[in-house]
Design a protein with these regions (language model features):
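Short, acidic/turn-prone active-site loops that include or flank metal/cofactor-
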Residues: 1-7, 56, 79-81, 195-196
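Active-site phosphate-binding strand-loop segment of PLP-dependent enzymes
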Residues: 4-58
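Short acidic/glycine-enriched loop/turn segments that link adjacent beta-strands
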Residues: 7, 88, 163, 197-200
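PLP-dependent enzyme catalytic core of the Aspartate aminotransferase-like
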Residues: 36, 182-186, 191, 195-214
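PLP-dependent aminotransferase class I/II
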Residues: 73-153, 157-160
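Short beta-strand-to-loop capping motifs
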Residues: 96, 169-173, 206-208
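Conserved PLP-binding catalytic core of the aspartate aminotransferase-like
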Residues: 141-142, 151-186, 202
Length: 214
């Protein structure tokens, strides 16, 4: 369970288990866990694989990649679906100890029903080559996100510090469901979940400056 500030509790990961996986930054909160916290979880789980899902790390988060040299049971997974806007291509990758990667290669075709086709492979390679565009795009999204945070604060919203391409916000006075309906009527689409603890929050994706100014 997440604590009052939307952080994971490392004690939850110190129980007997068959493996550990968690997102960093988190979705839908955008909250980032420190490398110290991740290392604490790794130290408590030396005999199982610990997977850190970094789908949103390119929007200002700190990657756990530096910890790979110390922990052979760590796997870091990332995707092209978010920061590179290539969700339809089904491109992702995993970085870890050579032995773990070997085991993954041995079994990947037995459970992966979304293997990449040739166009996806070609586009993925070209996307990696265009580092200038990638950095410019993520830098712009981060700048827009930080500006929108200030605007939302002035409008009475509260939210955890997001390191993703969205903001998980709630208003001090207006219920989230009421805001969700009003925004939808204005053709502005945000995410709302009618679930315990998050029912009074909206996940607001960061778009262009023009879109956010609406």
């Amino acid at each position: 369970a997440l604590d009052a500030n939307w952080h994971i509790n490392p004690e939850d990961y110190k129980q007997p288990n068959g493996g550990v996986i968690f997102p960093n930054p988190n979705a839908p909160t955008g909250v980032e866990e420190s490398l110290e916290m991740i290392e604490e979880i790794l130290q408590a789980n030396p005999d199982v694989v610990v997977i850190v899902d970094e789908a949103y790390v390119d929007f200002g988060g700190k990657s756990a990649l530096p910890l790979l040299k110390k922990y052979e049971n760590l796997l870091v997974v990332q995707t092209f679906s978010k920061s590179r806007a290539m969700a339809g291509m089904r491109i992702g990758f995993c970085i870890g100890n050579e032995k773990l990667i070997h085991y993954l290669n041995d079994v990947k075709f037995s459970f992966n029903s979304y293997t990449m086709n040739l166009p996806s492979q070609v586009m993925g390679v070209e996307a990696v080559k265009d580092d200038t565009y990638f950095k410019a795009t993520t830098t712009k999204i981060i700048a827009t996100r930080e500006r929108v945070k200030k605007e939302l604060t002035s409008m009475g919203f509260t939210f955890p510090d997001s390191k993703a391409n969205f903001i998980f916000a709630s208003h001090k006075e207006v219920p989230a469901e009421e805001l969700f309906r009003a925004l939808r009527e204005a053709d502005i689409y945000v995410r709302h979940w009618n679930k315990p603890r998050i029912s009074n929050s909206l996940r607001i994706s960061v778009g262009t400056d023009e879109e956010m100014d609406r």
